[in-house]
């Protein structure tokens, strides 16, 4: 008799469960070799904001469907609030088309609400954006800006409006984020602040992960552990992906990357888990590569 499938909360996030998730991910995405046990352990179990919220579809001793979101803390409409970053959604090819994506995600959100999660954010490619909007009622806040150029991107010291959303980085979660297995980070600094750069996998091109103003002294001890890039000129080509109204683009050698060259994901998504029906303003929402697990 064929084994039935069951949807279950991840449980204890045991080694056995992580290994089954890794097997599923590499079955569906065989080229995504960064999905190692060490990476999932770091992502799901070591986050100082809390362990991942996850649900699985089990078939016997195998996981054939998986959804995961990790806890984050953000400044949302002027107040600090706990929420989720939606990261991994995968269903084995033999079990696709059965509604597992929607049921796994909604089960995860309901569970997270019990722990005071007030929102979910995500960054999705064009293929994934529409199901998130239709089935999970996400707001498509904005396509991310993608630019390629040279040098530092300067920020305005006094932006025209306060951000309606930005992820809150403190010593503990920044230290954890910088320990992403397999990552290659560098820093450069000047009088206005510190830039964090991540390797893109393309020789000679680094991506700006985030920028920290000089006033963020509480993070300096964490950033000082990252190797300094000898000079900004030693790796001149830079990739910028995100949303940030503080960026002063005029006068800098950055150009918008044509659509056919853009890396995925590209759309910033938001879902309110409260009853207040909140939506983000794309003109003041901020998100950087550091805020989601791209590099």
Report each predicted region and the residues it spans.
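Conserved beta-strand in the GNAT
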Residues: 54-56, 62-72, 85, 90, ...
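Short, high-confidence coil segments that cap the C-terminus of an alpha-helix
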Residues: 52, 114-117, 183, 231-237
